[in-house]
Swiss-Prot record:
The gene is rpmB. It comes from the Bacteria. PANTHER family: 50S RIBOSOMAL PROTEIN L28, LARGE RIBOSOMAL SUBUNIT PROTEIN BL28A. Belongs to the bacterial ribosomal protein bL28 family. This is Large ribosomal subunit protein bL28. It holds the Pfam family Ribosomal_L28.
């Protein structure tokens, strides 16, 4: 299972680190994902959920 938020679709994005001399190296920015048990179709299931979705109340934990 990929590390993508089940509800919001947030996932890893890539970009560059830029030094003072404007050199660039690849970097990744990862979302704060938590493994949470939620009810899906009336059955408990463990899914990756972003902390933002948990805090905003979009997710109901079991």
């Amino acid at each position: 299972m990929a590390k993508v938020c089940y509800f919001t679709g947030r996932k890893t994005v890539s970009g560059n680190n830029r030094s003072h001399a404007m050199n660039q190296t690849k970097r990744t920015v990862k979302p704060n994902l938590q493994k949470v048990t939620v009810l899906i179709d009336g059955k408990p299931k463990k899914v990756w959920v972003s902390a933002r979705a948990l805090k905003s109340g979009k997710v109901e934990r079991v």
